[in-house]
Amino acid sequence: MNFSIVSIAALLISIWLISSSTISFAQNSRSQNMASQILNNQTLILPKSVRNFVILIPNEAHESPLLPKEQRLINQPYVPQHLFAPPNINIAWFSGDVGHTRKVTLEDQNSETIFDSSIKFNSISPTISFNNSETFSYYEEDANSEDPNFVLNGTITINDPQMQSNNNTSSQSTYEIMSTLMVPTKDIKEYTELLEDNQVDILGQEFFIDLREAGSGGANQTLLVLGSNGQIDDTISVFKKITASLPYS
């Protein structure tokens, strides 16, 4: 009798442990998907509950991929280059392009300019609110003197049906602010601790070899997807600390 009770208890504990591991694996996989989705598809589909998002302008964003020698670190001028977001969201751009002032010109689907802002290195643009369901495009021309035809470009799509049918990042999030950041892999522990100390959580990460590398030495950059619930100014102040300390700053 006692043996049966012990056996049943052991079985229940085993089931609970397996279920917990499965849930944890699913959550981790979903988080990994956000970072890999950006890196592989230049796209991110946000959870519906996010109210603020900061797009990263990465270091060397102004370098053209058509030049003889690759100078970019990541395969897109904005991270993510294509954003699918819920309505009633505020979006801004943070520039990590060392030594350069970037410019963002935003147009609606009628090609009318609705936002135009210059952004100094290690600073954030004014925030713009998006409510209407449509696709907006943004760009910067004349960013590279060696390739005058090169244009930095990205899109923001609000409330697209794709968000309803293909939101593999989860339909809800406990974070009101989400963002992206790129840091050297060798220093990931240092930056992880700084983020955690300031209540900025890592929701996903993807290690990759930057485009300047010849393919040896392994993944030397890490793309982070971040979430927080504090004030956006507090989150950006953490970004500024990290960006100012990066080896290419």
List each model region and its residues:
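Secretory targeting signatures
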Residues: M1-R30
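Short amphipathic alpha-helix segments
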Residues: K186-E206
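Extracellular/periplasmic metallocenter environments
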Residues: Q27-R30, A35, Q42-S64, I119-N167
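N-terminal edge beta-strand
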Residues: K48-N88
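Short, surface-exposed ligand-recognition loops at beta-strand->loop->(often short) alpha-helix junctions
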Residues: I177-E190, S228
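Beta-strand cores of secreted/periplasmic/IMS beta-sandwich domains, seen most often
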Residues: P80-H100, V104-T105, S125-N132
